[in-house]
Regions:
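Mobile "lid/hinge" segments at catalytic clefts and subdomain interfaces of large enzymes
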Residues: 31, 42-49
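Residues forming the flavin
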Residues: 1-36, 66-240
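Residue-level recognition of phosphate/Mg2+-coordinating polar/acidic sites
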Residues: 47-60, 75, 80-84
């Protein structure tokens, strides 16, 4: 295959060709609320959402209308020992997401932002314990007041090596082991229409392990993705 892979790298990364769901709540996702605080994380989520809307995202948000129906779903979940986490969802769609990112990329270029593709970063330039820039495999050095390493899953091994080389402390995050389960539309219809993606959590009785529903794709299809380190993962797609 291609190296680097144009499906999992490039502008917007794997997100450009994914289902494109925006979870508009700090209660789900990563550790941003722990780092910046809940209110600041919520503020940044809304700021990012506004950018998506500016470049053409669907205005419809799931999970905020028909309160009585959502409460009925919550009651059913409780009876099944499940916890329903409230989370508004905006769905971009597999066939629309990359168009939004294309408009965003074109806007950045028109605004004078230089984007370098097919340019491998060899190292981070550190001076007096502070990241000052990056060095490419072509020997070019780029300096900036702030360096953001948006490496995703594809660049995790590279970034781990960089951290070890520069003595940067790291800690392992939670690793979720997931499976894709296909069911008929009729079974999921109520959840899909009211919530689009039902955030359901279950704790196992023996070891209290957390099990959660993640990345559902209503009326969609399962697809495999392969990363450069040989890792095969299962993704899903859903169209508008």
């Amino acid at each position: 295959g291609c190296q680097p892979c144009s499906i999992t790298t490039g502008f917007a990364g794997a997100g450009a060709f994914s289902d494109g769901k925006l979870s508009l709540s700090p209660d789900v996702g990563g550790t941003l609320p722990e780092i910046l605080g809940y209110e600041k994380a919520e503020e940044l989520i809304h700021e990012a959402d506004d950018i998506y809307l500016k470049f053409g995202a669907d205005k419809k948000v799931y999970g905020i209308e028909d309160y009585e129906a959502i409460e009925a779903i919550r009651t059913k979940a409780i009876r099944a020992n499940l916890k329903l986490i409230e989370c508004p969802i905006r769905h971009l769609g597999t066939e629309e997401g990359y168009k939004i990112y294309t408009r965003l990329q074109e806007h950045l270029i028109k605004s004078g932002v230089e984007i370098k593709f097919m340019t491998m970063v060899k190292n981070i330039l550190v001076e007096d314990g502070v990241a000052k820039g990056v060095l490419t495999e072509q020997g070019e050095a780029f300096y900036a007041p702030e360096i953001v390493a948006g490496i995703g899953r594809e660049g995790s091994e590279w970034f781990s090596h960089i951290c070890k080389e520069h003595g940067i402390d790291t800690k392992n995050g939670t690793v979720d082991v997931g499976v894709r389960v296909e069911v008929r539309d009729e079974i999921m219809k109520e959840l899909n229409e009211k919530l689009y993606e039902a955030k359901l959590v279950y704790y196992t009785p023996t070891f209290d392990d957390k099990v959660r529903v993640f990345c559902t794709n209503p009326s969609g299809e399962v697809a495999t993705e392969y990363y450069d380190d040989g890792l095969a993962v299962v993704n899903g797609h859903a169209y508008k």
